[in-house]
Amino acid sequence: MNPLKYYRIFDEEPCPCGSGMKYSLCCKKREDSFQRDNKRPVEVQAAEILKKSQYKCCLHPDKSRCVKHIKEAHALQNNKIISLLSENGHVYMLNDKKPPLIIPTEKGEIETSTLLDKVGVNRATTATCFCDIHDDEVFAAIEKGAPAFDKGNNEHKFLYAYKAFIFEYYKKLVEQKAFQRMIKAKPSVLKSRMMVAYYRDISLTMREMDTVKDTFDKATLANDYGILQTCVIEIPGSIGFANYACIAPDYDLYFRKIKNTKNGIMHRLYITVFPEENRSFILLSCLHTDSKVYKDFFQQLQTANVDKVKYYFDLMLPLYSENIIISPRLWEHWTEEQQAAFTFYINLHGHLFSVYRLGMKFAMQNCRNQTTGFGDGKRGKIDLFAKT
């Protein structure tokens, strides 16, 4: 997009508030409906409004069978994954229920940071995005009482990928709706170039994800579990963290650029990392239509030394995904320096994210031809796979 258009809302385009009216006839000349707060930057106020927003819905495509009660559904299974990581009923994760920490920088700018916090297992990774019936029925094959993960079972792989996608989709949907409500209350926000850029990004992301949701919806209704290409990495032992993500990594295991964007459309992976009693898994899935994008990457992951694969995910996951659940056993095993580094990386966004993403590329470049030396205690500052 032309930089001028990226940072500016034009009169004839639809108003960002979602009214369906032209911007010039809607929010352009409207006054804010509440008093300005000059003590805090508009970006900080916007972040707090977004975090406080709630939205209840059922994202299953069969609306005819929905019930009224929308439950706190778990993105990662409480009784099979989170409970395995927990100590005294708690795990560590980013707690977006609390206000962000506001940090002034040396340049006089403001950064926000969400701290890791102990969260009860019944609240960890929950979202109000499924009704009682659909949450219970759709994911029954991987929930409590179901057999252990079977890497030859297409239904298992589909359900993990679908969960990773749909819970990330819900988060973006909440962001979009909260942003629209914020614009209705405070149209002056659109005078911020940063907020206009955010609006452009979230709008494009929703268009991309709506297309993928339509594909998952059709597959869910037809019980068609063959729409995905899945890379399964089995790791000996039970790891101390879990993760779900819908992301598009920029670099592969050998620092080559992954061409994940074509014609302006990003093609994402649906990732789940989880422990079982005596083994753990990393699942990476993409739509079959995207298999050419990730074919070489999948091949690298399945043929490389498992410790080098761990090193890659140690670098990539904290940078790309905020949905990492840490066992208290792992968190307390880390030094304060490691805890601080993890918190820093998982909060990166904007320019700083781009800088450290490039740093990840150089880190992988330096060990491109290295096949050993990635054992426990040798992989780097953040060791998600450390034995505790």
Where are these regions (language model features)?
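Metal-centered catalytic cores of metalloenzymes
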Residues: R40-A47, K52-Y55, V119, M182, ...
